[in-house]
Amino acid sequence: MKFVLLFGVLLVTLFSYSSAEMLDDFDQADEDELLSLIEKEEARAKECTPRFYDCSHDRHSCYRSELFKDVCTCFYPEGGDNEVCTCQQPKHLKYMEKAAGKAKKFGGKIKKWFG
């Protein structure tokens, strides 16, 4: 019985040690991957595509407005076979930005009245 208990404790200890090493390796790989992604994002951020311009070369290059990033929207023009992609802001995000701007403006008025 003592042998089984000792063997069980040894097995659990070895398993926890090996899993901790594997997690450390995964964490290191994740950090390296994250750093490379950040470097790519910084390099790509220099080439932003303005709103309503062609974004078919890089669909993630659209400008960022105050709160939200524009989306590359693709469609087929009427009577055409070629796909056209442009950076656009979805309407619901446009309305949310307008509401946030008005709330900010109203908050400034309240501060002025009571502050």
UniProtKB/Swiss-Prot annotation:
Disulfide bridges in this chain: C55-C72, C62-C87, C74-C85
Propeptide: 21-44
GO annotation, cellular component aspect: extracellular region
Keywords: Disulfide bond, Secreted, Signal, Toxin
Molecular function terms from GO: toxin activity
Broad class of where this protein is predominantly found: secreted
Domain of life: Eukaryota
Subcellular location: Secreted
Tissue note: Expressed by the venom gland.
Family: Belongs to the neurotoxin 19 (CSTX) family. 01 subfamily.
Descriptive protein name: U3-lycotoxin-Ls1l
Annotated source species: Lycosa singoriensis
